[in-house]
Swiss-Prot record:
Keyword Metal-binding: yes
Primary location recorded for the protein, binned into one broad class: plastid
GO molecular function terms attached to this record: magnesium ion binding; terpene synthase activity
Note on cofactor: Binds 3 Mg(2+) or Mn(2+) ions per subunit.
Protein's name according to its UniProt entry: (3S,6E)-nerolidol synthase 1, chloroplastic
Binding residue positions for Mg(2+) 3: D478, S482, E486
Covalent S-S links between cysteines: none
Cofactor annotation: Mg(2+); Mn(2+)
Length: 580
């Protein structure tokens, strides 16, 4: 059995014990909890979050479904054999046909199972660097460009100059090549600041693809529409994989084999996630905060989805469980600042977090004492685990992250207590910190335990651009959701509202367009950071990217202020079994 499969086997076994969780149907995922009564100066859509499952919405355990009754050992042996078979097929195909190798890598990544084939992908893409511009096929050039950039190779944008006319614009004849246009559109999502050719490529391909929708057959129109809505760079592979299953047509044997591998993988991973939810629910229930702080959100399943989306390797089970704990406290403290705390009490709470001394809680109200004590204990326990496992005490960095978060929350509380909105730039600068992204990624870095050095920790403490760009994307996406109703209270504090206040005569549509463009700019900055040398391990940078990809699912509200995409993601990852 291959080493990666054996490690997976150890994570997957044993199965979730049915008696450890209540048995309910998957429809219970959609049950709604009651909305909380909020003050009129609500900052971000807290009430809307209550539309997601709470800790009282347990998961029903499911098992891998097969056509014949087989032991788990048999399933793993067969899975390992198919993995090894596909590795050989991938190596051989890439040697014989460079484009076929790229197609196979693309399929593996779209199915979200590339962690099984990292060595093979590394070797193939390294060889592909020598032929980046030795082709006149738009599909192949764009695919190679995208896969190489995704893998950290900086391929220049001028590889697309061959597809421009004498005026320097993309040739109109390319409009007949739908497959090539989709590949070009996908490649354009890897652009960085100042890359005008890729900006033009996105506009050119996007316009022609939208135009083509009216005359394509239903199947092809679905594929094109999905490309426009969910380009691979900005989408979670785990969420889009099922769509790839439906739309990809097996024209060769390797795709059928790969789908078989992916189906088994999906079911195994789902069982791992269910096991983790049991652990998180147990921790959250024993913590008891939901009983003591009745105003706060009770949604450990939602909080866990951040960990599940960010750390996709099944072997990182312990890390996902531990990461959910600080994420839970980000939401909890956010509720204290947004929903319940008076300004005077919030000042005292922030001072206590900055001092990080248990005696600092003496003058706090009881509910704040409970929260601070729980945060203090969780952080110290977290630090001990990291030190025991990786030999580095992260407590100083963790304290800095929590203090920065509370300081940013307090700045916002003072703004809204005064009834005055800040300038949009000032709001966003503070909002990047109050997003909580830095807290989550700092904890994640130490959990992973890779390349922890004085240099990397110092950079982490200063909030590197990789983190701030992801945080800006979250803040702006969140604010787009809270600004959907132009008749809402003007003190909600979204970037859109700050921008409207600052620019007299600007319409809400113009302000939203400005926000959308800023999100695009932050993606370009994030792309640049992921291509630039940095001291962070690949697992961490990949998780940072996945966090940015997760954001639209977390903040895309519908007309009922519900989150249909997030609910669908939870259902796919935690409930639905892929038929074997």
């Amino acid at each position: 059995m291959a080493s990666s499969s054996w490690a997976f086997f150890k994570v997957f076994n044993p199965q979730i014990a049915p008696k450890s969780i209540s048995h309910i149907g998957q429809s219970d995922l959609m049950q709604l909890t009651h909305k909380k009564q909020l003050p009129t100066f609500q900052r971000r859509g807290i009430a809307e979050d209550s539309l997601l499952p709470s800790s009282t919405t347990p998961i029903k355990p499911m098992h891998v479904e097969t056509k014949h009754t087989r032991t788990m050992g048999d399933i793993f042996v067969q899975h390992s054999q198919k993995l090894e078979l596909f590795r050989n097929v991938l190596r051989n195909a890439a040697e014989l046909d460079a484009l076929e190798g790229l197609n196979m890598i693309d399929a593996v990544q779209r199915l979200g199972i590339d962690y099984h084939f990292q060595r093979e992908i590394d070797e193939i893409l390294h060889k592909q660097m020598g032929i980046v511009s030795a082709c006149d096929d738009l599909y192949e050039v764009a695919l190679r460009f995208r896969l190489l950039r995704q893998h950290g190779y900086f391929v220049p944008e001028d590889v697309f100059n061959n597809f421009k006319d004498s005026k320097g614009t993309f040739k109109q004849v390319l409009g007949e090549d739908i497959k090539g246009l989709m590949s070009l559109y996908e490649a354009s999502q890897l652009g960085t600041e100042g890359e005008d050719t890729l900006v033009e490529a996105e506009k050119f391909s996007g316009h022609l693809l939208k135009t083509s929708l009216s005359h394509l057959d239903r199947h092809r129109a679905r594929i094109v529409g999905n490309t426009l809505r969910n380009p691979h760079r900005k989408s979670l592979a785990s969420f889009m994989a099922r769509n790839f299953f439906v739309t990809s047509q097996a024209t060769n044997s390797w795709l059928n084999l790969l789908k078989e591998v992916a189906k088994t993988d999906f079911n195994m991973v789902r069982s791992v996630h269910q096991k983790e939810i049991v652990q998180i629910s147990k921790w959250w229930k024993e913590l008891g905060l939901v009983k003591e702080l009745k105003f706060a959100r009770d949604q450990p399943l939602k909080w866990y989805t951040w960990s599940m989306a960010g750390l996709t390797d099944p072997k990182l089970s312990e890390e996902r469980v531990e990461l959910t704990k600080p994420i839970s406290f980000v939401y909890l403290i956010d509720d204290i600042f947004d929903v319940y705390g008076t300004l005077d009490d919030l000042i005292l709470f922030t001072e206590a977090v900055n001092r990080w001394e248990i005696t600092a809680i003496d003058h706090l109200p009881d509910y704040m004492k409970i929260c601070f004590k729980a945060l203090y204990d969780m952080t110290n326990e977290f630090s001990c685990k990291v030190y025991q496992k990786h030999g580095w005490n992260p407590l100083r960095s963790l304290k800095i992250s929590w203090a920065s978060l509370c300081n940013a929350f307090l700045v916002e509380a003072k703004w809204f207590a005064s009834g005055q909105l800040p300038k949009s730039e000032e709001y966003l600068k503070n909002g990047i910190v109050s997003s909580g992204v830095n807290v989550g990624l700092v904890h994640m870095f130490f959990l992973l335990g890779q390349n922890i050095t004085r240099k990397s920790v110092e950079l982490l403490n200063e909030t590197p651009a990789m983190i701030s760009s992801s945080a800006a994307i979250l803040r702006l996406w969140d604010d787009l959701g809270s600004a959907k109703d132009e008749n809402q209270d003007g003190n909600d504090g979204s970037y859109v509202r700050c921008y409207l206040e600052e620019h007299e005569g600007c319409s809400i549509e113009e302000a939203r367009e400005k926000t959308i463009n800023m999100i695009s700019d932050e993606w370009k900055k994030l792309n640049r950071e992921l291509l630039s040398p940095n001291p962070f391990p690949a697992t961490f940078t990949s998780a940072s990217l996945n966090l940015a990809r997760m954001i639209p699912l977390m903040y895309s509200y519908d007309g009922n202020q519900s989150l249909p995409s997030l609910k669908e993601y939870m259902k796919l990852m935690l409930y639905e079994t892929v038929s074997m």
